[in-house]
Design a protein with these regions (language model features):
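Basic, glycine-rich polyanion-binding accessory segments appended to enzymes
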Residues: 1-93
Length: 93
């Protein structure tokens, strides 16, 4: 999954790509309460240590929150809902 669709109006700033960092947390799509460590999320999905170290995340530069684990999952906060007015498609090649 090299693209993600998000609710554009939930972004506070611009998007920036960076590698995952120790302690990064996000709320996986469909998880309505709490957050999960990105490292735990990747371990649960049997991602190798090598692939974990090169995992990219798209972050909101204003809030510093993870919007998308590139190629894997969007954060639940940025999901498209019935009240979404504008959809942003993010592509990473």
């Amino acid at each position: 999954r090299q693209h993600a669709l998000i609710d554009e109006d939930t972004l506070a700033g611009t998007l920036e790509l960076r590698y995952v960092q120790t302690g990064d947390r996000f709320q996986p799509f469909g998880m309505n309460h709490g957050t999960k460590l990105v490292s735990d999320y990747l371990t649960d999905r049997k991602v190798s240590l090598f692939d974990k170290q090169k995992q990219l995340v798209a972050i909101d530069t204003t809030t510093q929150k993870i919007v998308w684990l590139v190629g894997r999952e969007i954060d639940n906060h940025y999901r498209i809902t019935q009240s979404t007015k504008r959809i942003l498609r993010i592509t990473c090649q």
